[in-house]
């Protein structure tokens, strides 16, 4: 769309022939602009907000406490189950250890049969107390 069609002046020779249109304020002027701080009088009071937040916090902490009780009970149940089966597991391990120890003593007797004065199964450290072997030779085959 051309300027000539917009202003209804076809065939203008110069821009100076165009009628002068200038933006200005509406008749009577613009409405006053309020630039002061606006503090609303509606909505909950500070005390109401404080009480609501405090109540929500208290309810949340109550829920955390209930969750802690449940988690503690589940943990105790797990430990009780482990304490219950521990003697059975220990008995199985002791049985396995004894059979492996017998095999170890037989192997030691076979290897050291030519050494004079060697006593099979005797502790070489002479500490006076029994300790399980720490060298790993009596570990299960899966290890």
Curated annotation (Swiss-Prot):
GO terms for cellular component: extracellular region; mitochondrial inner membrane; mitochondrial membrane; mitochondrion; respiratory chain complex I. InterPro entries: GRIM-19. The chain crosses the membrane at residues 43-65. It comes from the Eukaryota. One of its GO terms (biological process) is embryo development ending in seed dormancy. Keywords: Electron transport, Membrane, Mitochondrion, Mitochondrion inner membrane, Respiratory chain, Transmembrane, Transmembrane helix, Transport. It is a single-pass membrane protein. The keyword Transport applies. It is found in: Mitochondrion inner membrane. The keyword Manganese does not apply. It holds the Pfam family GRIM-19. Complex I is composed of at least 49 different subunits. Accessory subunit of the mitochondrial membrane respiratory chain NADH dehydrogenase (Complex I), that is believed not to be involved in catalysis. Complex I functions in the transfer of electrons from NADH to the respiratory chain. The immediate electron acceptor for the enzyme is believed to be ubiquinone. Belongs to the complex I NDUFA13 subunit family. This is NADH dehydrogenase [ubiquinone] 1 alpha subcomplex subunit 13-A. The lineage of its organism: Eukaryota, Viridiplantae, Streptophyta, Embryophyta, Tracheophyta. The gene is MEE4.
